[in-house]
Amino acid sequence: MDASTLFKKVKVKRVLGSLEQQIDDITTDSRTAREGSIFVASVGYTVDSHKFCQNVADQGCKLVVVNKEQSLPANVTQVVVPDTLRVASILAHTLYDYPSHQLVTFGVTGTNGKTSIATMIHLIQRKLQKNSAYLGTNGFQINETKTKGANTTPETVSLTKKIKEAVDAGAESMTLEVSSHGLVLGRLRGVEFDVAIFSNLTQDHLDFHGTMEAYGHAKSLLFSQLGEDLSKEKYVVLNNDDSFSEYLRTVTPYEVFSYGIDEEAQFMAKNIQESLQGVSFDFVTPFGTYPVKSPYVGKFNISNIMAAMIAVWSKGTSLETIIKAVENLEPVEGRLEVLDPSLPIDLIIDYAHTADGMNKLIDAVQPFVKQKLIFLVGMAGERDLTKTPEMGRVACRADYVIFTPDNPANDDPKMLTAELAKGATHQNYIEFDDRAEGIKHAIDIAEPGDTVVLASKGREPYQIMPGHIKVPHRDDLIGLEAAYKKFGGGPVD
């Protein structure tokens, strides 16, 4: 596309140079800028990428978007705008032909449950033989092809490119995990949502948002801003078991479908049966009651299942067809995932990293604990520490507790575990400043019949260490290796 045509979509302060050049790429990553690219510089929390403008010029890039004039060669056109990231969003959606308009887009937000609900929607679509894409905490996936991701919600240009990639691959739908950070930072500007789903709201990310009111407002942006294409039918799916849903009803102009277990809703789960092999329940709907079985474990996953089923149903698939698909879904990686059932202990990993998430996790596993419940939990560095003692208190519902850091970054690991220990309600706990050693200790003290839960990370493949360096780390692999060494079995894949 000609740059002069592209920039007709935005208001600029001034242009230094010529816009008569062909553009086939937009990037906010200076390392990928090249001839034919537009490089959009921005002022981030830790890095001002304006300082890389000369680098991109050396790589052949001839057009940059900046918030003030840079010292660059005369053959590099500079477009000066007040808000570079807002302009990046407009340019990306325009250049890539508004990809979110070309498929059904589901957006899932909430403190806990985003990954599970989003993954379930994607897996249901695949069971229905539909081409589908997913983008979130577990990376980027088109059908069964997966790639890793850095953030739950990537920055606006990368996000738009991923949606375009899904469209080009023939995806009929795409499910996005929508983080509060992504909403506040404008990463989702221009994305057209067909269905918005809310799981719950509990304390988290106050290091970023400051207050629960601000955090809640951030989440509400998804429901008030589903997009601008009024020709599409749009729907909102709300969890009536969470009181924040009442507020979300007031901010959305779209039709709402509610689900719940404890509170009255349009769609409800009754006669619930649970085991470590899965759940079953009667799905009570406005159209009748349907028996549902699922391999997912825990009462909280029943809420997630209902949210996913309603979302897919809202776009035209019958409930009977969806329920058949749900019965055969694969587990969501790292979400109440039982590792190697042949072991004499129940070894479980989960992503729970808030007091609410941990409570629900313990509620799910405690009825099936045969001997002791050994619970390992970590606290992340450079995060809201006001929630930490409550996490320690909840962890002490277990018989034995191990406190570790989780992505300590530049914080002192010993400080993080001490903050967790402030909430301890019994003395059966130990602190490790090395998470891997804490996991090995959990296995070392476990006896046949015990349940060992490794919480906070799921299958996250790294630890963020000082200097924000990512060091390879997998809870599941460390736990399995220690368990096989003690009890036999293996090897670790």
Swiss-Prot record:
- Catalysed reaction per UniProt? UDP-N-acetyl-alpha-D-muramoyl-L-alanyl-D-glutamate + L-lysine + ATP = UDP-N-acetyl-alpha-D-muramoyl-L-alanyl-gamma-D-glutamyl-L-lysine + ADP + phosphate + H(+)
Which Gene3D superfamilies does this chain map to? Mur ligase, C-terminal domain, Mur-like, catalytic domain, MurE/MurF, N-terminal domain
Q: Which cofactor does it need?
A: Mg(2+)
Top-down, what is the taxonomic lineage of the species of origin? Bacteria, Bacillati, Bacillota, Bacilli, Bacillales
Q: Cite the pH-dependence comment.
A: Optimum pH is 8.4-9. Optimum pH is 8.4-9.2.
This protein's record includes keyword Cell wall biogenesis/degradation:
yes
From the UniProt record, give one GO term of the biological process aspect: regulation of cell shape
Which protein, by its recorded name, is this? Answer: UDP-N-acetylmuramoyl-L-alanyl-D-glutamate--L-lysine ligase
Organism the protein comes from: Staphylococcus aureus (strain NCTC 8325 / PS 47)
EC numbers for this chain: 6.3.2.7
Subcellular localization: Cytoplasm
Query: What does the miscellaneous comment read?
Result: Expression of this protein in E.coli results in 50% incorporation of L-Lys into the peptidoglycan (which normally contains meso-diaminopimelate instead), leading to abnormal morphological changes and subsequent cell lysis.
Q: Which NCBIfam families does this UniProt record tie to the protein?
A: murE (TIGR01085), PRK00139.1-4 (NF001126), PRK14022.1 (NF010628)
What does UniProt say on post-translational modification here? Carboxylation is probably crucial for Mg(2+) binding and, consequently, for the gamma-phosphate positioning of ATP.
Q: Which residues bind UDP-N-acetyl-alpha-D-muramoyl-L-alanyl-D-glutamate?
A: S30, N151, T152, T153, S179, R187
Primary role: Catalyzes the addition of L-lysine to the nucleotide precursor UDP-N-acetylmuramoyl-L-alanyl-D-glutamate (UMAG) in the biosynthesis of bacterial cell-wall peptidoglycan. Cannot use diaminopimelate as substrate. Can accept L-ornithine as substrate, but the efficiency is 400-fold lower than that with L-lysine. Seems to have a role in beta-lactam antibiotic resistance.
Motif L-lysine recognition motif: chain residues: 406-409
Which InterPro entries does UniProt cross-reference here?
Mur-like_cat_sf, Mur_ligase_C, Mur_ligase_C_dom_sf, Mur_ligase_cen, MurE/MurF_N, UDP-N-AcMur-Glu-dNH2Pim_ligase
Q: Which GO terms describe its molecular function?
A: ATP binding; magnesium ion binding; UDP-N-acetylmuramoyl-L-alanyl-D-glutamate-L-lysine ligase activity
Q: Which residues carry this modification: N6-carboxylysine?
A: K219
Q: Which gene encodes it?
A: murE
Which GO cellular component terms, listed alphabetically, does the Swiss-Prot or TrEMBL entry include? cytoplasm
Where mainly found? cytoplasm
State the pathway, as annotated in the record.
Answer: Cell wall biogenesis; peptidoglycan biosynthesis
- Kindly indicate whether the keyword Cell cycle belongs to this entry: yes
Which Pfam families has this protein been placed in?
Mur_ligase_C, Mur_ligase_M
Keywords from the named record: ATP-binding, Cell cycle, Cell division, Cell shape, Cell wall biogenesis/degradation, Cytoplasm, Ligase, Magnesium, Nucleotide-binding, Peptidoglycan synthesis
